[in-house]
Swiss-Prot record:
Pfam families linked to this entry: Sod_Cu
Gene name, Swiss-Prot/TrEMBL: sod1
Annotated organism of origin: Prionace glauca (Blue shark)
PANTHER family: SUPEROXIDE DISMUTASE CU-ZN -RELATED
Family matches, as InterPro entries: SOD-like_Cu/Zn_dom_sf (IPR036423), SOD_Cu/Zn_/chaperone (IPR024134), SOD_Cu/Zn_BS (IPR018152), SOD_Cu_Zn_dom (IPR001424)
Source taxon at top rank: Eukaryota
Self-association state and partner proteins as the record states: Homodimer.
Record: residues binding Zn(2+): 61, 69, 78, 81
Catalysis performed (reactions): 2 superoxide + 2 H(+) = H2O2 + O2
Cofactor binding mode and count: Binds 1 copper ion per subunit. Binds 1 zinc ion per subunit.
Primary site of residence: cytoplasm
Name of the protein in its database record: Superoxide dismutase [Cu-Zn]
Length: 152
């Protein structure tokens, strides 16, 4: 199964992310985001596909198991915690991520939810404060888009 997300925000940040999953295998995300400041930026699937008031309408990180925030390789993490994407000196982040907790079908599907790129680096839940355990201290939402089904 395939999916796509077009990221847009109020500023210069834009991007496209393609998703692919074969049977019960991991979801592969391949994408490019431009207009970022150089460095790492938090990258998450948020709970809702609602962008009526911009990216803030997307709600919190997708977290069906009520866990604390963590890194993509941690046992204790939100399903939507994808860690960071890293922008080069030109503000472009090109990436490929494989994730076993995401699904493109079934009751925990991320189709119809929002993908968000954040202003700051995600501390992966290791910041030592409550906000770290909720959001990774990733800061404001620079761009977002609803994940939709794509043609196979």
């Amino acid at each position: 199964m395939k999916a796509v997300c077009v990221l847009k925000g109020t500023g210069e940040v834009t991007g496209t992310v393609l998703f692919e999953q074969a049977a019960d295998g991991p979801v592969t995300l391949k994408g490019s985001i431009t207009g970022l400041t150089p460095g790492k930026h938090g990258f998450h699937v948020h709970a809702f596909g609602d962008n009526t008031n911009g990216c803030i309408s997307a709600g919190p990180h997708y977290n069906p198991f009520s866990k604390n925030h963590g890194g993509p390789d941690d046992e204790e993490r939100h399903v939507g915690d994808l860690g960071n994407v890293e922008a080069n000196g030109n503000g472009v982040a090109e990436f490929e991520i494989k994730d076993r907790q995401l699904h493109l079908s079934g009751e925990r599907s991320i189709i119809g939810r929002t993908l968000v790129v954040h202003e700051k680096e995600d501390d992966l839940g290791k910041g030592g404060d409550e906000e770290s355990l909720r959001t990774g201290n990733a800061g404001s939402r620079l761009a977002c888009g609803v994940i939709g089904i794509a043609k196979d």
